[in-house]
Amino acid sequence: MKLRPLQDRILVKRIEEEQVTAGGIFIPDTAKEKPQRGEIVAVGNGKKTEDGKVIPIDLKVGDKVLFGKYAGTDIKVEGEDFLIMREDDILGVIE
């Protein structure tokens, strides 16, 4: 199944954080916070204005992005976990 977000929504796959610190300390799952980084896997066409024009999304598939801790909605597609969020939820692009 392929999922295509609508309007200004973006489908993001979380990038998991390291499980071991630089000092070699293992971080158990119970002590980890949700990652706030991800890779864009699909984007919508853009936001529609009141007069019907479409404002295209500035992001593209493959961009690595930062987003807020509580941004987006968790979804599962074919057994994989993703976030679907609006373009406004993206804080920045990692270059």
UniProtKB/Swiss-Prot annotation:
SMART domains: Cpn10 (SM00883). Keywords: Chaperone, Cytoplasm. PROSITE patterns: CHAPERONINS_CPN10. It holds the Pfam family Cpn10. Together with the chaperonin GroEL, plays an essential role in assisting protein folding. The GroEL-GroES system forms a nano-cage that allows encapsulation of the non-native substrate proteins and provides a physical environment optimized to promote and accelerate protein folding. GroES binds to the apical surface of the GroEL ring, thereby capping the opening of the GroEL channel. Heptamer of 7 subunits arranged in a ring. Interacts with the chaperonin GroEL. This is Co-chaperonin GroES. It comes from Geobacter metallireducens (strain ATCC 53774 / DSM 7210 / GS-15). The gene is groES.
